[in-house]
Amino acid sequence: MSSSTPVQPPAVGRVYLVGAGPGDPELLTLRAVRLLGKAEVVVYDHLVSPAVLNFVCPTAERIYAGKRRNEHTLRQEQINALLVRLAQEGKQVVRLKGGDPFIFGRGGEELQTLAKSGVAFEIVPGITAASGVSNYAGIPLTHRDYAQTCLFVTGHLRHDPHVGNDSNSADISGDIRADLDWPALTRPRQTVVIYMGLSGLADICRQLMAHGLAADWPIAIVQDGTLASQKVLVGSLADLPERAKTAGLTSPCLIIVGEVVKLHAELAWFSPDAM
């Protein structure tokens, strides 16, 4: 009777779509930290804070797949194909995205590709920038006296020829006027949060005023929210674009529009120096 070595079944790969939160690594979920510590490959985006990568297993392969305006390391189709290939090779892959992967992160599109290819996947939510950054800026998104509705908006849309086809790009470009529902953005008693809006700030403010908001309507812009480098500028639709330019703000920035912005002076608590 001959003996033979048992044939090992092929390793089964899996992709974990993980939200990295708004920047501060202490805002990661426990599950995100655990998965980063055991992943074989981590494919991460531009908006992932470098401090978050400290949780990655030292032996894991790290693949940067970030996109900025006019600077794409990999096209989206290449990223999709990469995730499929790694999983089919039997790897345990973390696809790491800034904020929450299902809010302006193209996570849904990537998972559609995995599903069509028969690749197993799981989703780990993260704190989206609107929530994390507004909290660190001391600006509640809803308040009984000011706002019962909150809208999340991105100025970077699918067909934008200047930026490319990636909502994780760090900024917007081109004419956004025809793409946003401006009347909806100027309704009373609501807060509007605009992702990736720094380069379009002047146009955004002009359009909001043209569609009915007062020139002195409160608006804030936050750079590097939740990080030690966080900067918060509060002003009006009329003056904030010039003030932001003078301050030399750079991406990533988040814009918050609405009367809740007035609460920043009272509720600001975050001191980067105390981190």
How would you label these PLM feature ranges?
Residues 60-67, 118-122, 141-148, 212-221:
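Short hydrophobic/aromatic-enriched beta-strand-loop microsegments
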Residues 61-75, 147-156, 192-193:
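Acidic/glycine-enriched edge-of-secondary-structure segments
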Residues 98-188, 231-234:
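Class I SAM-dependent methyltransferase SAM-binding "motif I" and its flanking Rossmann-like core
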